[in-house]
Amino acid sequence: MFVPFLIMFREGLEAALIVSLIASYLKRTQRGQWMGAVWVGVVVAAVLCLAIGIFINETTGEFPQKQQELFEGIIAVVAVCILTYMVFWMRKVSKSVKVHLEGAIDNALNSGRGQGWALVAMVFFAVAREGLESVFFLLAAFQQDVGIGAPIGAILGLVCAILVGMAIYWGGVKLHLAKFFKWTSLFILFVAAGLAAGAIRAFHEAGLWNHFQDIAFDLTDVLSTHSLLGTFLEGMFGYQEAPTVSEVSVYFIYLIPALILFFLPPRSTAGSAIAAARKINP
């Protein structure tokens, strides 16, 4: 429950901050009449992401068992890639997003005829990317946790993100965003490592990967996944009481380089600024 909550809170907060920055800039530049276009972009993006998530979730239930395992592995790999990209993209461009977002708004509203649609498209792409990141992660999370806790956590995370975003816009809440994104990003890397290990397990169950399947260690008597702590760690980090050599290897092959790159001093380059502009206004 906590992992879907945190991911949706973080992703929802990113989307809420984007909308908040757009609204503040439009208000500050006396262009508040364009807020309708902003909300059109937000709603269309949200509906599209929700529809994609529901469609994928419903159609995969009809697959035979091995195909379901294969799909779970693919979704886990996609989720790992998206989460990793999300962490390192935010690390690079968090200080320059506002500048480039305002530039993208000016470009959209100075585009002549169809400027309203240009603003709708800009907001749509900015919000839809955050939404699609969430969709693929939640699909992976829901496959690992089939209980009601994961959907409830995701909904609560999104609601909290919206409330915090509104509070930030109205000036009632001051959140140290740099620290927030830094520590949630670190947490997400451990989550992604667990998903990577889960992907190799799914590929084995689908019959695609049969190497290094010896049990690396067995902690059943020490920390079983049926215990409260074991269940918590399984849902949060993909913990397994008796993982195979391949699962442990994939976990650390992903996690160690990711942590090294994460703690390296970030580069402040024009390339980061260009990346930010492309994500906001492709």
UniProtKB/Swiss-Prot annotation:
Can you supply one Gene Ontology CC term for this chain's record?
A: high-affinity iron permease complex
Keywords, comma-separated and alphabetical: Cell inner membrane, Cell membrane, Ion transport, Iron, Iron transport, Membrane, Transmembrane, Transmembrane helix, Transport
Which ranges of this chain reside in the Periplasmic compartment per its record? 1, 57-69, 140-147, 201-244
Subcellular localization is given as:
Cell inner membrane
Q: Where are the transmembrane segments?
A: 2-22, 36-56, 70-90, 119-139, 148-168, 180-200, 245-265
Provide the membrane topology annotation.
Multi-pass membrane protein
Which residues are exposed on the Cytoplasmic face of the membrane? 23-35, 91-118, 169-179, 266-282
Q: Which GO terms describe its biological process?
A: iron ion transmembrane transport
Which superkingdom does the taxonomy of this entry point to? Bacteria
Q: Name one GO molecular function term.
A: ferrous iron transmembrane transporter activity
Chief site of localization: membrane
Q: Subunit composition?
A: Part of a ferrous iron transporter composed of EfeU, EfeO and EfeB.
Q: What does this protein do?
A: Uptake of Fe(2+) ions across the membrane.
Q: Which family does it belong to?
A: Belongs to the oxidase-dependent Fe transporter (OFeT) (TC 9.A.10.1) family.
Name of the molecule in the record:
Ferrous iron permease EfeU
The scientific name of the source species is Yersinia pestis
